[in-house]
């Protein structure tokens, strides 16, 4: 399976701290989005599956599978927290409280994570 960017390019960019997405395309006539997700996620706690809406005949349908995040943002009540140390495993003690309203802190994270 060919991935984009290539593994070496991805690793170089990752080491410099640039946000990026690793992706591939595949014909999925024998696989559903959910079955692919279940195989790839393998019960990982912080995994996600996002699908495009139906009716995307012109541009096709898209599935995004997220695995092993490097940042986790969560909110309990109106207290936002962030964990930037997830690659070695997720521990509650690694979450830091963000002293901003929850929506503002999430907006800041979106801006910080922007991929050109």
Labelled PLM ranges:
Residues 1-116:
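Signature of the chorismate-utilizing enzyme
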């Amino acid at each position: 399976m060919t991935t984009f960017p290539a593994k070496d390019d991805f690793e170089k960019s990752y080491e410099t701290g640039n946000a990026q997405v690793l992706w591939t395309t595949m014909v999925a006539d024998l696989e559903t989005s959910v079955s692919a997700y279940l195989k790839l996620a393998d019960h990982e706690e912080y995994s996600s599956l996002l699908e495009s809406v139906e009716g995307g005949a012109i541009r096709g349908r898209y599935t995004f599978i997220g695995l092993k995040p490097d940042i986790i943002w969560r909110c309990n009540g109106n207290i936002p927290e962030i964990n930037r140390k997830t690659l070695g495993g997720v521990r509650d003690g690694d979450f830091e409280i963000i002293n901003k309203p929850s929506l503002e802190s999430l907006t800041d994270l979106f801006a910080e994570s922007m991929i050109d």
